[in-house]
Amino acid sequence: MTGLRAAFASTLAATLLMATPVVAQTREAPKYGGSLEIGTVYVTISALSWDSADFNWKHNHDTGQFYEQLFAADLSKARRNGGTQAFVLDAHLPSEAIRGELAESWEWKQNPLRVEIKLRKGIMFPEKAGVMKAREFVAEDVVFSYDRLDKSPKKILGYFDHVEKVEATDRHTVVFTLKHPFAEWDYRFGWGYMSGIMPKEVVDAGAANWRNATGTGPFQLTDFVSGNSNTYTRNPAYWDKEKIGDKEYQIPFVDKVVYRTIKDEATFVTALRTGKLDILEAIRWQNVESLKKSAPQLKWNRWLAQSGTFLAMRVDQDGPFKDVRVRRALNMAVNKAEIVKEYYSGNAELFAYPQHPDYGGYFEPLDKMPASVRELFAYDPARAKKLLAEAGYPKGFSFKVQVCSCNPDHMDLLPLVAAYLEQVGVKLEIQPMEYGAFLSAMTSRTMTAGYFMNNGHTNPTTTIRKSFVTGQTWNPSGWSDPAYDAKMEAAYREPDEAKREAMLRDLTREILDKAPYIWLPTPYVYSAWWPWVKNYGGELRAGAVRPGPIYARIWVDQDLKKKMGF
């Protein structure tokens, strides 16, 4: 079996900054049973779609417990097992950290360029009353799932343009034929956001209805209350095992996993403190010290946020933001170093977007950037006023900014940004929105001139493509430059990893310099869990925002939980 990206020579290793290094744990014999109550990374946001054809970013987070994929993270490489991987990156798996999930083996072949994937035999879709009888997962299920995405009217522009065809050559073999080398072939339909394998019977019954959902995964969705909870129940016929010590164990260990949706920050922090949550995956630094004092038994992991924070300035409509001098001025008007020091109390990096520091050779630190980029991160209100005057706005201007009320950090940070801008004559009209309306404003291109958001880094190529290539859904500024688009396409087709890294560094420098956003610091985030949560070290994703395989390997020490008074 060849390496997953043998054709593309990927050697990137992701390494996360930690508050306390996670070392290989003493392996206890697991115990079955109990439930796992989780406030996930997206604790404030309920499930948005159960249908992969909607191309909704959160779909995989909520369905990855039952819709499995061809590939997933090799969790044996986690730091808690003595490996090198933190598994917190939102949608980036280094080649050496990928395993076959539904795929048993794969091999690259030439003339034509294709990857031949052998599927595991004997994996079953369980019976689902009113939807389907139990049956074996086969290659046609992969072809069906791919074709349905490819034909979806909601498909991301150009998403599968590199694929010539997908075909089942026998019951347990599927072949992807490519038009040319493509750096993201495995991410796009292997372990990506929409890569879950959905049986045709679910589509026939209605894939948008959660009650019809069923897949080959370790858990089945048994209840959903919008804005409150997702409940996943153990699949007793699940095929995979977890090796602990020298012994393999059938998984999952817990009987039930429950996602709790809690919009209020104080409420979900209290839920962790009082043991109502076993794990809380995303905690702002402001809450850490109080939690450590009131619940000293909690275990911790610290990680640099997997999304960039910025104020997008629309360049696709007439107004001040058409002028690069205005965009650069607004960057210089915000004291970003002071935000790191005073607002985040040092718990942030001044520069960590659009590339992430954990992306190895794709990332170029600020001190290596051209002077024209560096000055965007230096506070210079006098220079900002001069640029505004040169652009025809000596007295400034005002504009509206939408922000999601679901994000406590943004609700606190945006008024601070507004105060800086007001010092150079630019006034913001802030419009908080619930998440559904906020997301819809972007996807329908009805947002205001300013749009304050997080956007996931995803991976070293997608972070540029989705944010700055013409017509992409997650391009809030409306950036469009045919020459830039062509350079991005060339990077995707470059099979040499070192050359591709250099191309992406150039693309990153260029877009930073053009300043379609007010670039803001990237905060550190904390995860915490109680010591009765076993076989866990703070891992968050085993694919594209997909935690399902991680939860399947956790077991709960119910005796310890009782001993601790919970």
State each model region's role.
Residues 37-40, 134, 138-143, 171-175, ...:
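Alpha-helical secondary-structure segments
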Residues 135, 204-210, 238-290, 306, ...:
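Ligand-site clamp/hinge motif
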Residues 37-110, 214:
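N-terminal lobe/hinge region of extracytoplasmic solute-binding protein
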Residues 31, 107, 111, 116-121, ...:
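Surface-exposed binding/hinge segments that line
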Residues 74-79, 85-93, 97, 187-258, ...:
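Gly/Pro-rich hinge or "lid" segments in bacterial periplasmic/extracellular proteins
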Residues 97, 102-153, 259, 268-271, ...:
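Aromatic- and charge-enriched surface segment that lines or borders ligand/interaction sites
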Residues 40, 44-46, 55-65, 225-230, ...:
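Detector for C-terminal structural segments
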Residues 165-166, 222-233, 260-318, 337, ...:
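Extracellular/periplasmic solute-recognition and catalytic clefts
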